[in-house]
C-alpha cells in the first residue's frame, strides 16, 4: 500500500504518524509531499532526514498548489496496488488505518472510506457552527447523489490503485475529497465506510 502524506510544516505530527503506521505489518511505502513555497527549509531538511529511518519513504515537492495538488502528485508516484490518502497532522487517526487495511484486504475492489458520521463520537473540538454546516452539507450530498454513505468529504480512504489510475485531480482545494470519491463511484467501485474520529490538529 502507498500511503500519501501531504505536509506543510507539521513535522512533529508527521513523525508521530509515521511511527504508528510503520508498525502495521503490510508491504508499504510512505509518500510525503511537501510544498515548494510554504514548507520551511528546516522542516524540509527534517523530512529528508526521515529517509534514514524509513527506507520505504520517499519525499516529493508538490507542483500544483493546495492539498489537492499534493494528493495528485502522490497518486501519480504511487507504486503499490493500493493507495491510502490521509493527513500528516493527526486529524486523521493513524491508529485507524490498520483496520482499514484489514477490511481492504478482504474487499479488493472496494474503496474503504473513513466516516465521521457513523458514530456519535466522530468529531472532537470541531465547533458547533462548523458541525451543523457539515451535517447539512453531507445530507444534501447524500440526497443529490443518492448514495448510502454519510461522509463524502473526509479525505481518509484506501483505494485500489486502478480506481484512480490515470485520473488527474481538477479541484485542488478542499473539493478534491469529494471529487476523488465520485470519480471511482461512476466507474462502479463500491464504497465501504468505517467509523472514524476526527480531532482538531494542534500543528500545521
Question: What are these model-predicted stretches?
Answer:
Residues 27-38, 60:
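Short beta-strand/loop segment that forms part of the nucleotide-sugar
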Residues 1-2, 29:
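Cell-envelope/extracellular polymer assembly enzymes that use nucleotide-activated donors
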Residues 10-13, 39, 67, 93:
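Donor nucleotide-sugar binding loop of glycosyltransferases
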Residues 62-77, 82, 95-174, 201-204:
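Acceptor/aglycone-binding surface of glycosyltransferases and processive sugar-polymer synthases
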Residues 81-91:
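Short beta-strand-to-loop acidic/aromatic patch adjacent to the donor-nucleotide binding site
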Residues 147-148, 169-172, 181-199:
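Catalytic donor-sugar/metal-binding loop of nucleotide-sugar-dependent glycosyltransferases
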Residues 34-44, 90:
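A conserved acidic beta->alpha catalytic loop
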Residues 10-23:
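Short, well-formed alpha-helical segments that are part of the catalytic scaffolds
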Amino acid at each position: 500500500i502507498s500511503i500519501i502524506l501531504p505536509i506543510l510544516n507539521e513535522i512533529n505530527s508527521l513523525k508521530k504518524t509515521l511511527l504508528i503506521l510503520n508498525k502495521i505489518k503490510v508491504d508499504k511505502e510512505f509518500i510525503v509531499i511537501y510544498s515548494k513555497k510554504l514548507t520551511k527549509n528546516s522542516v524540509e531538511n527534517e523530512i529528508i532526514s526521515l529517509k534514514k529511518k524509513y527506507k520505504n519513504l520517499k519525499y516529493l515537492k508538490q507542483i500544483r498548489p493546495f492539498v489537492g495538488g499534493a494528493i495528485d502528485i502522490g497518486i501519480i508516484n504511487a507504486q503499490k496496488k493500493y493507495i491510502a490518502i490521509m493527513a500528516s497532522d493527526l486529524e486523521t487517526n493513524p491508529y485507524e488505518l490498520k483496520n482499514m487495511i484489514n477490511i481492504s484486504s478482504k474487499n479488493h475492489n472496494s474503496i474503504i472510506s473513513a466516516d465521521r458520521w457513523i458514530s456519535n463520537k466522530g468529531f472532537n473540538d470541531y465547533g458547533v457552527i462548523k458541525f451543523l454546516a457539515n451535517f447539512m452539507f453531507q445530507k444534501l450530498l447524500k440526497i443529490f447523489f443518492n448514495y448510502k454513505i454519510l461522509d463524502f468529504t473526509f479525505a481518509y480512504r484506501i483505494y485500489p490503485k486502478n480506481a484512480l489510475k490515470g485520473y488527474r485531480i481538477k479541484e485542488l482545494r478542499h473539493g478534491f475529497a469529494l471529487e476523488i470519491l465520485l470519480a471511482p463511484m461512476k466507474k462502479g467501485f463500491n464504497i465501504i465506510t468505517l467509523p472514524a474520529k476526527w480531532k482538531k490538529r494542534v500543528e500545521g
